[in-house]
Amino acid sequence: MIQFFKANMEPRKGLRIAEVIISILLCVASIVSIGYGMFQVNANVNDAKFIQSIEMTRDRELEDYSEDNTVCDVTYISGDKQLVVSYSYEDYVHLEDDSITAYEYETDNGTKLYFDHQNITDQEIQHSYGQVKANELAPVFNFGIASFILMISVLIMTLFAKQFTTYEKSWFLSIMVLATIISVIFPEESANGVNGIIIMLLYLLDTFLNILCELLISKQSRFNFLVSVLVEIVEIAMCVVLMYRFATMVTTLLFWLPIDIISYINWSRHKDEEESELTVVRKLKGYQEVLVIVGIVVWTIVVGYFISGLDISTDFYNNQLLETAIIYIDACASAVGIANGLFIFFRLREQWIAWYICAFLEAVINVISGQYVLLVLKLGYFTNTTYGYIKWSKYIQSHSQEKQTQISA
């Protein structure tokens, strides 16, 4: 193992030292940021004095619950003041009032806390204080998480430097730096009782693993499928947390995870004779492309119609038109995704075209959902897909006289 890293790590001493120093600084930044955030969130609150009672109005736009929800959060607002009250679904159904009397308390360090009752306990004060501080310090936590993932990115490019070109390393690290910046500027809000910090962690992991997987595919490396398994696990977690994109979640469970394992085996059996790290790739015939397009259209209509008829609680509140649009876009994305998975399994160049379509459809969903950090991932998709398509095309052209490049009828 040590000999492997010695043979593949960055050969230029100056650059290698610089990358190690950057990794150490990122690690320190991550520890300091997360440590500071945890210290603030878990700080003991000695006392909280009552300030005043306030009438707050219920914000119904943030509500979309069904019997599947055991806990229903209702938000009340008054200017910039906010109170979130958790109800059981049974109590939520019978909740008719659009206003509530909130009680404002202030801690010894000036933090304002709001409750729906007086005579609060120390445990209630501590819990509310922790939630408020976690929301305030979300950019700090996001920076700490992103710095740690960025450190791993730098180390990968250092330890496997000889496996990547300068362009590939620059592309990979640029996307991760951009994701770090976006995660700090646009922190995620909580959803379905899950703190926005956890959601951002999933987004950053999804970005990191996806672009690494994309890069390995463009290099015709079978190891992309090992990374892809981690991608599927993260994306399933995202679907569960946000309660959305159910077509994608089912497709991931029943199709992508099995196809990743099978594809790894298949690619391992078709190594390039001259370069064992490469896998032999090829392309489709025209009529086969038409059949694929027809299949995608049929899948989109059938699956979209089926899921739109289900009574499922989503993270898009009460906007029925938006929910339906997301369902059909997601159905189309899942159809293209399945085609993409088969293209990758059969080592077909057309998988890059499928990547283009998937990236566009998912970018639309990300914009609608306000998932801005994932737009960085889509930017990475578009740029690397172009790179991968050109790279595979050159390989196919150079081997056209040696190997069959089209699937026989």
Describe the role of every protein-language-model region.
Residues 74, 82-86, 103-107, 111-116:
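Short linear proline/tyrosine/threonine-rich motifs used for host-factor recruitment
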Residues 90-102:
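Short nucleic-acid-contacting surface segments enriched for D/E, G, S/T with interspersed K/R
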